[in-house]
């Protein structure tokens, strides 16, 4: 496995590799758990590397991308502690509960949509290529961190508006 930090120019041109952590996953135990360090720790450490670089690159906008396998709240808590000008774009798979009991995604889409995006989703195993139309919302919210504090985050929701019959919405 490899977790790289890759810089890109605003024109989308890759500029090299800033940092990379490579490892081999350990086999799962009989109970199905994997021994050793949690892989989500690598996402936090990647953000820490960017925080170190932020001091050396004050004119550069740094954006950290993390997939849904990252421990998102742990990452946001640590980034908040570091207080560096690194933005993050985190793909979430969990509809988090907010203070007051409502859910993150429904709270975000209660506001007016910012607009729409239309694109062609490429074919994948068992799925044909198709056009997708999504509405996009954004809202800055205070997310409970599970430890009695809150983390400010700009939350973006993109919802497919008219999926074809039998298609799973994107």
Q: At which residue positions do the language-model features occur?
A:
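Single, function-defining residue in the core of a domain
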Residues: 5-170
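Short glycine-rich loop/turn motifs
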Residues: 1-3
């Amino acid at each position: 496995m490899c977790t790289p930090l890759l810089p890109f120019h605003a024109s989308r041109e890759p500029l090299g590799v800033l940092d990379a952590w490579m490892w081999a996953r350990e086999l799962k135990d009989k109970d199905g758990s994997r021994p050793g360090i949690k892989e989500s720790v690598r996402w936090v450490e990647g953000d820490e590397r960017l925080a170190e670089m932020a001091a050396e690159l004050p004119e550069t906008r740094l954006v950290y991308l993390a997939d849904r396998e990252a421990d998102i709240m742990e990452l946001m808590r640590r980034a908040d502690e570091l207080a560096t000008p690194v933005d993050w774009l985190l793909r979430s798979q969990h509809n988090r509960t907010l203070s007051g009991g409502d859910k993150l995604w429904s709270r975000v889409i209660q506001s007016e949509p910012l607009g729409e995006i239309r694109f062609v989703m490429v074919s994948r195993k068992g799925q044909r290529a198709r056009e997708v139309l999504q509405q996009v919302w954004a809202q800055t919210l205070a997310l409970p961190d599970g430890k009695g504090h809150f983390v400010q985050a700009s939350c973006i929701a993109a919802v497919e508006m008219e999926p074809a019959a039998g298609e799973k919405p994107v």
